[in-house]
């Protein structure tokens, strides 16, 4: 279904010496197969997806060698209008693929472009919303959805169009555990229906029992291929060396929290009567909350619970009621941006400079070029000083925003999904950066669904549910148990053993042409088997007609 033959590609960015992103890559994926592209940030995973969905070379220009075939069609020669009927795409940032203001319109957009009749379109949307459990998200304003809810709508929109191939770029990056379970169900469903699924991903554990192969890229080349069994057997040290994160669910909890981080017992952040409403509806209510000085608090909860809204209120970006005290001093709402720094979920929204180095010095004119390069080395961005921030991968942009936060030295540090798009190596680097920045701050809050990050740097858990604080506890042994409960650790996520009709559906999805031929042969065989009975029937009819003189 997908075939890349000796493909090399470099983006056209106006520089004399363009960096080769992919070098002599050969790859193929069959019908009904789920293949996972993994590797460090910037290794070429997203570029491979762009080759498959036709965005390269029709949208992203550059030097392309080799050929890319999808469903027997050469992508270089196939217009995007035709490619979109074959390949569906879920991008790393779902906002970049939205064209409507409401969720129902967005779900129907692909079907409208394919001229699907309205009655059939309505029936298809009802079916998709039911199968993917999206009923509560229909007829909603897209701008009021959380990042995870937007990702669910993007997945539903693609699935509704029934493409033969689906490419997904970090589909789990902003999802809570319940939404990840829905994503697992969706991927299994697409496999069972015979669709080819190609996923670029750092969070690998949820694909256990789903992925058929893991392809590891390094510096634009395919370094290694793993079977599911071989990937699951990789040790922690080997995964670190390859830049991979947990491959199995139980590997998420290999580490234990470090309770030696807090040196003080004074209050770093105090909140009283914080409330926020949207369209006459209260979405956040925090009557009272005290966070110790030096604490690194993991803010957890389901998508849409109010976690990001909470961080935006503390950063002074949303007008709210109530008081906020940092180190015992009451901070007026308009003064919050001077005391608080927020690394947003979509890092590209905070990058304004023409160069990577310029991004660090934009709000820090006193920062020397030498010091700025040292920070970039700490971020793993050395050698990229003069690149445009927009040319970085999603994970690299995230780390650049973290570096900017480190240079700002604010009293309260807020991070919204800081490990979105981060590989195993940079997950560790992110945890170290957060701990380093926390040494200069009163407190730190991290909005995250990532237990790997939490166990590497957090000291407390703050559980927000339906806009209210449900629990605030230290991340000790009891805290880990509570976190696992919130994350639905007891829920069944492994692939169930298929029997009966589901097993038959999976087989028919993968071997549809073979079964079609078998059906044809069965039909012909049935005709031959019926032949003698037909002859007996007509002979008996003739005999009876003769005996009755033609009256039968």
What residue spans do the PLM features occupy?
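Conserved ABC ATPase "signature" region
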Residues: 119-137, 369-384
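Conserved ABC ATPase signature
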Residues: 141-145, 149, 388-392, 396
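Membrane-integrated ABC transporters
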Residues: 489-529, 549
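ABC ATPase NBD Q-loop/coupling interface
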Residues: 67-82, 323-337
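Catalytic Walker B motif of ABC-type/P-loop ATPase nucleotide-binding domains
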Residues: 166-169, 413-416
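H-loop/switch region of ABC-family ATPase nucleotide-binding domains
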Residues: 201-202, 448-449
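Conserved beta-strand-loop-alpha-helix hinge in the C-terminal portion
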Residues: 221-244, 468-494
